[in-house]
Amino acid sequence: MIKFVFQTQFSGMAKIKLQNRTFVPYISNEEIEKAIDRVADKVNADYAGCTDVPVILCVLNGSIIFTAELLKRLTFNCELATIRLSSYQGTETTGVTRKVLGLTVNLKGRRVIVVEDIVDTGHTITDLTRILAEAGASDVKVCTMLFKPAIFKSTIKLDYVAMEIEPKFIVGFGLDFNELGRNLKDIYILDE
């Protein structure tokens, strides 16, 4: 796992503006891809030779790009499912998780790998773990692209973490600011 702290020098990456906010370069696509490679290697090692078909649960919308990149690297049979939860309004977490779109597959007796874009306070992943237990999942692992350990308040274990970051608001590679910026190949941090 790599820990990222804000740096001011990035070659080829410029500031961007989304609505009335300015974001500056934070993590390059090259670093993101390397981190995904490392996480995929760990997941593949843990699931090598599995005889069941684990469910890869993509948490919409933020983890779509991370999930797609991770799936391309997995070497075992798996099934893709989605769920959509919401806990953000603008740049702030509300602390309240809403289920916007329910599970798309029956999880009773199944092993599940939750794929998240970012874990910060841990409220959403805690609520999701409860939802999956109620749905009958036999085992739940959590894989996140980004983790903010400085503000994490949950006891949930994060099994696979690609990168640790500061508790700052970011966009890009699936993460958004009011639904904008998901398509950016790099990750940017709010210029405060």
Residue ranges and their predicted role:
Residues I2-E192:
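PRPP-associated nucleotide enzymes
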